[in-house]
């Protein structure tokens, strides 16, 4: 699907973008991979590692629609990974978060339309479901924008989808590198916000592969959610440092005890497939009549029961300490 195609990744110098680039280069023969991001140093460092002839690097901000549109010329597929995602920082700088996560999302949509992009997938987060913090609220708004974009496409062929998942093991700013840094510095204890806290976990590699597969299965308008394991934060801390004690510091601004990826309010829109769930659009598209119970590959899903929810504390899949360490070690080697 990606052979001889032009692919653009916003926020491409981040953990996801670099892994996505690695997977594309190892498994496909793209015509161009365009990395679109703000930080010239990160682009310089990434270019020293990913220097294949097909690589292109564009300095730009998703807030700048003109620059974004210029970078998207002749692009076939877009992955929108750029975001302001640090929860407490977003709480203290709300308008900056809104400019990047909401205005930036609309700029991506407009640039896709202007350049005839075939498909665009936006990365979302479990924090967008029943949000209690500004980051989650902006990502919910972003999700809504990308879903609704399919309805305003008119005679344009661009299709938009959303991929929503939980904490990415090893990604920049996540708890795993934070804990490992404390351990390497000789910490005597690890800070835990609440002993009851649970989270969804996915490796960078699995996250990338899930997004890749969604390009093939999407009609346009779906929110795709992978079936991934949960784990208690205390189990993670014990797995990384079994001999260290834990210090309870309390929940930070905007945090939840448990994350939700599908709320019961969306159960009537949700279909279960073998390895994932798909939330169909809540609005009826004017000129499209897709059957979202069957994906674009012809695979059939089943409607979930009314009142179904998918939360990190009611998840049937739980990662053991051994399994999580395997994910962490594999991610570092990847």
From Swiss-Prot:
Q: EC number(s) for this protein?
A: 4.2.1.115
Q: Which Cys-Cys disulphide bridges does the record give?
A: none
Say yes or no: keyword Nucleotide-binding present.
Answer: yes
Q: Which SUPFAM superfamilies match?
A: NAD(P)-binding Rossmann-fold domains
Give cofactor(s), names only: NADP(+)
Q: Which UniProt keywords apply?
A: Lyase, NADP, Nucleotide-binding
User: Pfam families recorded for this chain?
Assistant: Polysacc_synt_2 (PF02719)
Q: Which residues form the active site?
A: 127
Per its record, the protein catalyses: UDP-N-acetyl-alpha-D-glucosamine = UDP-2-acetamido-2,6-dideoxy-beta-L-arabino-hex-4-ulose + H2O
Which positions are annotated as binding substrate? 85, 167, 175, 193, 252, 255
Single GO molecular function: lyase activity
User: Which InterPro entries does the entry link to?
Assistant: NAD(P)-bd_dom_sf (IPR036291), Polysac_CapD-like (IPR003869), Polysaccharide_Synthase-Rel (IPR051203), PseB (IPR020025)
State the signal peptide span.
none
Locate the residues binding NADP(+): 13-16, 37-42, 61-62, 81, 85, 123-124, 135, 139, 168-172
The enzyme class is lyase
Keyword NADP in record? yes
Family assignment from sequence similarity: Belongs to the polysaccharide synthase family.
The task this protein performs is described as: Catalyzes the first step in the biosynthesis of pseudaminic acid, a sialic-acid-like sugar that is used to modify flagellin. Has both C6 dehydratase and C5 epimerase activities that result in the production of both UDP-2-acetamido-2,6-dideoxy-beta-L-arabino-4-hexulose and UDP-2-acetamido-2,6-dideoxy-alpha-D-xylo-4-hexulose.
- Record note on quaternary structure: Homohexamer.
Official protein name in the record: UDP-N-acetylglucosamine 4,6-dehydratase (inverting)
Q: Which organism is it from?
A: Campylobacter jejuni subsp. jejuni serotype O:2 (strain ATCC 700819 / NCTC 11168)
- List the gene name: pseB
